[in-house]
Structure formats: C-alpha cells, structure tokens
Amino acid sequence: MALLCYNRGCGQRFDPETNSDDACTYHPGVPVFHDALKGWSCCKRRTTDFSDFLSIVGCTKGRHNSEKPPEPVKPEVKTTEKKELSELKPKFQEHIIQAPKPVEAIKRPSPDEPMTNLELKISASLKQALDKLKLSSGNEENKKEEDSDEIKIGTSCKNGGCSKTYQGPQSLEEVCVYHSGVPIFHEGMKYWSCCRRKTSDFNTFLAQEGCTTGKHMWTKKDAGKKVVPCRHDWHQTGGEVTISVYAKNSLPELSQVVANSTLLNVHIVFEGEKEFHQNVKLWGVIDVKRSYVTMTATKIEITMRKAEPMQWASLELPAAKTEEKQKEETTE
C-alpha cells in the first residue's frame, strides 16, 4: 500500500518496501515568507510566485517519512477550585444600568451600484524603486526557461497543490488534482480560497489534496502579462478594514482598484509583467468616498472606511445556499 511522504517539499506517495536512503528529495528547513518573497530556510532561492515556491526542488536526499507531523500543542490552562475562585472575586454592590438602544443596522445596498475608482496614494519609496527599474531595464533582458516549448523531465506541475512531475509524454494524459484558488494566510491559519480547509501547520497545508480535477500545467504560456497569485491578508479596526497585497514594485498607471458599497475589484500590475486579480463580495458595507489605496515598494494597502462602526465576522460575505447548490451542479 502506497503511503504519503510528509517530508517538506516532497508530498509523493511511496512503497515502504522499496524506501531507500536517497529515495526522497526534500527540504530539511522551514518555509520563510518575508516582503512578498517565499523560500526555504535551507535554500537561497526566493520567489514571489506561490506556485513556483511549491515547485522548488528539495536540497537534501533521505528516506521517505510516513509520520504525520503533530499539530502545534496548545498550552494547558489549569484552574483552581471553585471555592478559591470565589474568594478571589472582588465583593461589590450590584447596580443595574439600562443599556443604550442598539443602533439601527444599515440596509445592505444593491451590488449593482456603479463602481468607483478608489484614490491611489503613491509613496516615495515606490517612486524611487520604479525610477531605478527604468534605468536598469534598458540594459538587461533575461531569458526564462518558460519561453521554451520543450518540457524537461522532472518539471513540476504549476497548478497549486499538485506535486506531480513530468515523466514523459504519458504525463500529458494524467488527471491533475489541484487547488483552483489562491493560498491565504490569515491570523496564523493557512488555507486555499477554493475549499477553506483551515490548518495552523504548514506541512498539513502543503499536504492538502486538491479539490478540482483537470490537466497538468507544465509551462506558463500566458501571452503578455502573467496572472499570478499574491500573498494577501486583512485586518480591521472599529472604523476601517485594510487589505494588504504583498506585490513588489507595482505600476500605478496600469493598476486599478474599483468598488461600490459592497463589492471590491482589485487589478494590480507589478514587477513589469505580472498581474494580480481579486474580486471580493464584502461582508459589510463601506463608504467608497472615504476609502483609498496606498501603494509602496513592497505592498499595496486598500483602506476601506466602514459605513457603520461594527465588527466584521469575515472579509467576504459567505455565498448563499442557493448559489452554492448552483456551483455544485455546474461542477458536477
């Protein structure tokens, strides 16, 4: 029976009887994410593309490992006896205070409202970085391996969550099981936007089986600019919600962020030839006129002013049950 290898960067299935000391190629280090760059602590290679990060070949040989790494242990909280707790409680007189009347919730506007371009604020660091790139771009041109139509043996599939490698023409006929969404890292949790199976352990996240079937993508042949995923997260205060997209050297003249009260469409062009797209059906209602975008050399921050001061349960509004059923019927 084939077992799944849990060594970082491997994810292959293996036969325990044929397992040898050099059967597995893996990363002994840990994943490192810094300023939109992704890599392994044991290797020097860095990339901004998450699918390229997943396809970085391991730097160490060893035996396959079938033992699943344990989930992070939560600290045990010990409580004292009820008597001791009651003695520690401060003694005071009760005063009943009438709570203020709740603020009437704003009625959710129609998603068909016209979209408005959010104001772009460009930082000095981004202006300096773009000026340097313009000076150097006229002297250097790098040829990439992806420009070639030839697929080399051992090339990793570029689909998210797929760990298969190209072994010859027969690989073109294989069914690819992958994640059609993008990776999301938020408040210590890691998951794919397409299936939302959340985990706090990075190895478990990498080992999650895909939720979509299709054909392997051995090369990226996007004409012109390439649409790529970007690491992004969000946070909120009482009056604002902020989305951070970690894309370096974004181009203000080619980028656009539009929104209405309940929808947000993000289109960012960065590093000359890469594009990031994201459409968000917002959980709450925003004030478009008081919302704006700040573009720096390392990231883009979308600051949205809340129409009412309330805590958002999530960034995106969950799909209605009728919409989910329609999606399931179309996928089947």
Swiss-Prot record:
CDD domains, from UniProt? p23_melusin_like
Q: Which SUPFAM superfamilies match?
A: HSP20-like chaperones
Q: Where does Zn(2+) 3 bind?
A: C157, C162, C176, H216
The CHORD domain sits at 5-64, 157-216
Binding-site residues for Zn(2+) 4, renumbered to this chain? H179, C194, C195, C211
Q: Where does Zn(2+) 1 bind?
A: C5, C10, C24, H64
> Which residues carry the post-translational modification Phosphothreonine, per the record?
T47
Report keywords, A-Z: Acetylation, Chaperone, Metal-binding, Phosphoprotein, Repeat, Stress response, Zinc
List the Gene Ontology MF annotations in alphabetical order. Answer: ADP binding; ATP binding; Hsp90 protein binding; zinc ion binding
InterPro entries the record matches: CHORD_dom, CHRD1, CS_dom, HSP20-like_chaperone
Residues annotated with N-acetylalanine modification? A2
> Biased-composition ranges for Basic and acidic residues?
64-82
- Biological processes, Gene Ontology terms: centrosome duplication; chaperone-mediated protein folding; regulation of cellular response to heat; regulation of centrosome duplication
The segment annotated Interaction with PPP5C runs over 2-77
Keyword field contains Lyase: no
Record-listed Zn(2+) 2 binding positions: H27, C42, C43, C59
- Residues where Phosphoserine occurs? S51
Gene3D superfamilies assigned to the protein according to its UniProt record, in alphabetical order: 2.60.40.790, 4.10.1130.20
Residues forming the CS domain are: 227-316
* Ranges where the record places region Interaction with HSP90AA1 and HSP90AB1: 65-316
Q: Region Disordered: which residues?
A: 62-82
Q: What is the recorded function of this protein according to its Swiss-Prot or TrEMBL entry? A: Regulates centrosome duplication, probably by inhibiting the kinase activity of ROCK2. Proposed to act as co-chaperone for HSP90. May play a role in the regulation of NOD1 via a HSP90 chaperone complex. In vitro, has intrinsic chaperone activity. This function may be achieved by inhibiting association of ROCK2 with NPM1. Plays a role in ensuring the localization of the tyrosine kinase receptor EGFR to the plasma membrane, and thus ensures the subsequent regulation of EGFR activity and EGF-induced actin cytoskeleton remodeling. Involved in stress response. Prevents tumorigenesis.
Q: How does it assemble?
A: Interacts with HSP90AA1, HSP90AB1, PPP5C, ROCK1 and ROCK2.
State the protein's name: Cysteine and histidine-rich domain-containing protein 1
Q: Which organism is it from?
A: Bos taurus
